[in-house]
Amino acid sequence: MAVVVTAWLAPGEMVSFLSSLGPHVDFVPNAGNAGDALINVGCMDALERAGVEFTYWSQSQVETAPLGGRTVVMAGGGGLVPPYDTTARFLSILKERAGRLVVLPQTVVGHEALLAGLGPSVTFFGRERPTLEHLAKSAVGGAQVLGADDMAFHADIGRLLGFRVSDHGASIERLRMWAEPRLLSVVAGDRLSAFRLDAERTSVHVPHLNRDLSSLAFCGMENPGRCRLTSAYFVRYLDCFRTIETNRLHVGIASARLGKRVLLHGNSFFKVGAVYEASLAGPDVDVTYVPAPER
């Protein structure tokens, strides 16, 4: 059965789509790092704009949550790629239990058998061309396939900049983060290097004063408040700099949305470059893409 990618939804169209799901959904967020927290916040903010109430089920709660026959919205992200397996495991659970399942914009590599098993009760969003091409070949079980921007573009950045961290259990250690970026911005000349140091790192030179902010800013996602707390640390840290150089996709997205000058490097596969082409390669933001070094 051939799959037709029927549309790419603009942000307003995504909100309208979410509104069509009804007055209430069950929301399953990403696990991961501060970039994933920003995706989760974008999902929640879009649901709020759509007038849809939601129950938040952290991934530790999913296996026992009463989701049978209900409408479930799964956060987007980059977890359906090697070497990660958590997103695939939860997608396998949710496709069997949910009455209707919406998977918000993802990057996908592999997982052909899982994709082939997605039936007509599933709507699956890709966030860039390679994923949509892969879904067109692999999601042959009747799922609806759509395209849309990464959900971090739906996060209310102004709300995060005004977030009261003291209302959400912020420790003294975490509050010290506000001193470090201001000091670092002086030492590093108002320029932040935020290259990743994990499995998706490349051979790009990493400066001595590098801060892998997606890991550094993380302080939990067990409930909506902790997601917003993590995201608030994340965007406030970035807001202390004028120029950000990174190969972390959501450092790049958040920095662009803050109006910063961004040098966005590729990661270890196509993800960053493909999302840049889909959503950041325009005149409205100051983002320059730098391909990853050849291996």
Q: Predicted regions: what is each one?
A:
Residues M1-R295:
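Active-site anion-handling motifs in enzyme catalytic cores
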